UniProtKB/Swiss-Prot annotation:
<feature type="transmembrane region" description="Helical">
    <location>
        <begin position="323"/>
        <end position="343"/>
    </location>
</feature>
<dbReference type="Pfam" id="PF00361">
    <property type="entry name" value="Proton_antipo_M"/>
</dbReference>
<dbReference type="GO" id="GO:0008137">
    <property type="term" value="F:NADH dehydrogenase (ubiquinone) activity"/>
</dbReference>
<keyword id="KW-0813">Transport</keyword>
<dbReference type="InterPro" id="IPR010096">
    <property type="entry name" value="NADH-Q_OxRdtase_suN/2"/>
</dbReference>
<keyword id="KW-0793">Thylakoid</keyword>
<feature type="transmembrane region" description="Helical">
    <location>
        <begin position="99"/>
        <end position="119"/>
    </location>
</feature>
<keyword id="KW-0874">Quinone</keyword>
<comment type="subunit">
    <text>NDH is composed of at least 16 different subunits, 5 of which are encoded in the nucleus.</text>
</comment>
<protein>
    <recommendedName>
        <fullName>NAD(P)H-quinone oxidoreductase subunit 2 A, chloroplastic</fullName>
        <ecNumber>7.1.1.-</ecNumber>
    </recommendedName>
</protein>
<feature type="transmembrane region" description="Helical">
    <location>
        <begin position="24"/>
        <end position="44"/>
    </location>
</feature>
<feature type="transmembrane region" description="Helical">
    <location>
        <begin position="354"/>
        <end position="374"/>
    </location>
</feature>
<dbReference type="InterPro" id="IPR045693">
    <property type="entry name" value="Ndh2_N"/>
</dbReference>
<keyword id="KW-0150">Chloroplast</keyword>
<keyword id="KW-0520">NAD</keyword>
<feature type="transmembrane region" description="Helical">
    <location>
        <begin position="484"/>
        <end position="504"/>
    </location>
</feature>
<keyword id="KW-0472">Membrane</keyword>
């Protein structure tokens, strides 16, 4: 009898929760229509996996890619609409948030074709891989529009949990397991630090959780210059620094990059940076508006450390993925310049533009690494020697992406850095910009060192991996080459037409 009553209560509670969720989706679903498309794609993937055999694998890729493209289309159709707040103030929709969501969707759309051949060759579970990628994308999109502390915590955890699972996807690989453990432990610690900072912010504002209400609460309680806010700022900066791989919270990055499957590294290297940058711009600009001098100083120190350590340590690396890990630490230091400049002097516009170029440069480089790794089984930089003699297309593609990452003209990376540094210079960040310029020169050195190896023709320097290299057919349907071509074009041509891109980015400001 007691069990029967408990069962009825459980059914009633479940029904109430379902009806409340249905009510929210019915009246607020239009605000998260791009996210709803991804959720529908996730459900379709699960249904197909449960009801079909291995012959329907192409459908899984098609559904994943289509749901991402449709989400991008939904975002573009909603462009220039008035800012809206939904879900009782938990979610905000505006152009600024939507362009970060667009960048995350773009990353995922390019990463799926980049992963197809790798998954087939390594015999990884396909459905779970795609589910984790789409769920992480969904978490990143919700993070971009998060308007309260609870959503800001839950959304990145959704992204992070999928990232942990993806990094350890090759379970038989000891390095992958090690990378997952380090990522999980350090990620959990950083989340705890972030939440501790949120608790100080919550208490100081008089119990508010919405970002704008926190700022108003700090004025009402006159706590905006209190020691509690300084403590909150330090803890939140450390937590966000981990998500961005800012020094000194960068220790996890090289190990995770080296141990994780290469397509996973490509995905994490860009999506995590975009999502965390969206979080940083909103949380520093709104609740910490009255502490702008303090967080500017904190971010300047972290950016300088990241640019110097990232680029100097990258010189000594022998693994291509570890080199790109340290390179990404330096690259995010450049992005921080745009966050510090902010609305004034087009800081956010230059940051968004550079992140768009960084996505194409980084994913193009990883596409080349995936292609080379599948044919040779190595990740050592020395083993790339003489690649041009065997596969000129792959060698030239990798060279162009690396040169663009280094910021050599007339490639997109040069114009992106130029505009970013110019905005920083106009804002008076002379020392920070000078460090950025010097470390960019350092980065060009180790990129050119790799390009020199690629183009060498001396037999004594060519390794057995390149001698036995199997080049794919010219008319191949290789999906990696599709991603590679798109990224290489995006890393070279857009730099020439910077003005329209900057103009679009300027329209995304608050």
């Amino acid at each position: 009898m007691i069990w029967h009553v408990q069962n009825e209560n459980f059914i009633l509670d479940s029904t109430r929760i379902f009806m409340k969720a249905f009510h929210l989706l019915l009246f607020h679903g239009s605000f998260i229509f791009p996210e709803c498309i991804l959720i529908f794609g996730l459900i379709l993937l699960l249904m197909i996996d449960l009801t079909s055999d291995q012959k329907d694998i192409p459908w899984l890729y098609f559904i994943s890619s289509t749901s991402l493209v449709m989400s991008i289309a939904a975002l573009l159709f909603r462009w220039r609409e008035e800012p809206m707040i939904s879900f009782s103030g938990n979610f905000q929709t505006n152009n600024f948030n939507e362009i970060f969501q667009f960048l995350i969707l773009l990353c995922s759309t390019l990463c799926i074709p980049l992963s197809v051949e790798y998954i087939e060759c390594t015999e990884m579970a396909i459905t779970e891989f795609l589910l984790f990628v789409l769920t992480a994308t969904l978490g990143g999109m919700f993070l971009c529009g998060a308007n309260d502390l609870i959503t800001i915590f839950v959304a990145p955890e959704c992204f992070s949990l999928c990232s942990y699972l993806l990094s350890g996807y090759t379970k038989r690989d000891v390095r992958s397991n090690e990378a997952t453990m380090k990522y999980l432990l350090m990620g959990g610690a950083s989340s705890s630090i972030l939440v501790h900072g949120f608790s100080w912010l919550y208490g100081s504002s008089g119990g508010e959780i919405e970002l704008q209400e926190i700022a108003n609460g700090l004025i009402n309680t006159q706590m905006y210059n209190s020691p509690g806010i300084s403590i909150a700022l330090i803890f939140i900066t450390v937590g966000i620094g981990f998500k961005l791989s800012l020094a000194p919270s960068h220790q996890w990055t090289p190990d995770v990059y080296e141990g994780s499957p290469t397509p996973v590294v490509a995905f994490l290297s860009v999506t995590s940076k975009v999502a965390a940058s969206a979080l940083a711009t909103r949380i520093f600009d709104i609740p910490f508006y009255f502490s702008s001098n303090e967080w500017h100083l904190l971010l300047e120190i972290l950016a300088i450390l990241s640019m110097i350590l990232g680029n100097l340590i990258a010189i000594t690396q022998t693994s291509m993925k570890r080199m790109l890990a340290y390179s990404s630490i330096g690259q995010i230091g450049y992005v921080i310049i745009g966050i510090i400049v902010g609305d004034s002097n087009d800081g956010y516009a230059s940051m968004i533009t550079y992140m768009l170029f960084y996505i194409s440069m980084n994913l193009g480089t990883f596409a080349c690494i995936v292609s080379f790794g599948l044919r040779t089984g190595t990740d050592n930089i020395r083993d790339y020697a003489g690649l041009y003699t065997k596969d000129p297309f792959l060698a030239l593609s990798l060279a162009l992406c690396l040169l663009s990452l280094g910021g050599l003209p007339p490639l997109a990376g040069f114009f992106g850095k130029l505009h970013l540094f110019w905005c920083g210079w106009q804002a008076g960040l002379y020392f920070l910009v000078s460090i950025g310029l010097l470390t960019s020169v350092v980065s060009i050195y180790y990129y050119l060192k790799i390009i020199k190896l690629l183009m060498t023709g001396r037999n004594q320097e060519i390794t057995p991996h390149v001698r036995n290299y199997r080049r794919s057919p010219l008319r191949s349907n290789n999906s990696i080459e599709l991603s590679m071509i798109v990224c290489v074009i995006a890393s070279t041509i857009p730099g020439i037409s910077m003005n329209p891109i900057i103009a679009i980015a300027q329209d995304t400001l608050f």
